[in-house]
Amino acid sequence: MDLASAFQEALDDADVMLRRGAPRAEGRGESPARLAFGTVVRAAPVEEGGELVVLDWERKEVTATAPILPREPSVEDDPNPRGNTRGCRGIRWHDGELLAASYHTLERYDASLHRRGTLSDGLMVGLHEIETTEAGTVWVSSTAIDAAVEYDLSTGDQVRALWPREHPHLQNTLGLEPLALDKSADNRLRFLGPTASNDDSHLHLNAVAVHDDRVFGLCNAHAAIVDLTNGTVVVQDEALQGGHNLLIAPDGTALMNDTYGRAVCVFDLARGRRVRTIDLTRYEWVRALIRPHIPSYWKEEVARKAGWRADSIARPLFVRGLTRHGDHLFVGVSPASILQIDWTTGELVDAYCYSTDVRVCVHGLAVMD
């Protein structure tokens, strides 16, 4: 984060501390009966890095939990101080089954979180968000190797893989070079260190979405939404830098979480531009959630900037996790909480806090109706 961004963040946090935000709306409208969400715990040991949770949304009661961690193969040493292999990433509810991504495997559960099996492959490396299709396949964003890979859910076979760093047009547009990779090998534990992610060509492809028979990817290292099928940059916007999650509505409207800007951003893919921003700090419920953590965050952040500490700092209101149910958006934040926002009005209509530990963040979200 540069000095100007840090100064603006400090001003925003001062506003959060000093002023009240907008109240919750009175009417909640139609809500799903159940949600599933995954958590990631910053700087935790691998075995304590996160879990999959099923929540009765109406009653705000947790009905089942399951720890999520990389196993078979297990990770004995994670060189990333934040915990690169930790927790439960993207999740999807598909045909009566919950799919939950660990670092290199899709864990498969029933609605009560009884484990039904796994799907893993040598090209599943640093998984983030996933997308299921009506054809019975699942796309995974294999972030560590900048690939989008499709698998058949019934057989586990690989259907196809898209490699944006190898597409000539994207190489010219974004200045990319292919990743040195043996695609036939088991790469699941070969990219734990920072070398590949520090490369200038690294895209950090962390979300995939299928729309009009095309596959789109969020490449946040280059602040871009990319048509992976045709190899074209559809949108470039500063809000995409470091962003997470990608939903595309039938009309071509794309939604993503501006993780550091603490907002949900809306893009018109046809016009290639941002058309709306929903600032999550406008809501008083959110301000009350993060106020207790802001003073300690800045104390630790100043110490880190001064070189007095080197460990990772958990940021209040780190935005991850996004799904849609009718006119409502469900947005995940830290400390691990879920916001229900009326898409048409921008009002906060409901919310739920799972943990007050600022290190715990929601990552994946799925409606189970």
Feature annotation, model-predicted:
Residues 57-59, 110-114, 152-156, 228-231, ...:
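Short loop/turn segments that connect beta-strands within beta-propeller blades
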Residues 37-47, 99-103, 140-145, 216-221, ...:
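Conserved beta-strand positions in repeat-built beta-propeller and related beta-rich domains
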Residues 334-369:
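Blade-level signature of beta-propeller repeat domains, shared across WD40, Kelch, NHL, RCC1
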Residues 30-32, 93-95, 132-135, 210-212, ...:
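Residue-level detector of Asp-centered blade-edge/turn motifs that repeat once per structural unit
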Residues 21-26, 72-90, 125-131, 171-173, ...:
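Repeated scaffold domains used in trafficking and secretory/extracellular systems
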Residues 64-108, 114-131:
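Blade-loop segments of beta-propeller domains
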Residues 248-249, 253-269, 273-340:
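Loop/turn-rich, solvent-exposed surfaces of beta-rich toroidal or solenoidal domains
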Residues 66-70, 79-83, 118-123, 162-165, ...:
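Surface loop/turn motifs at the tips and blade-to-blade linkers of beta-strand repeat domains
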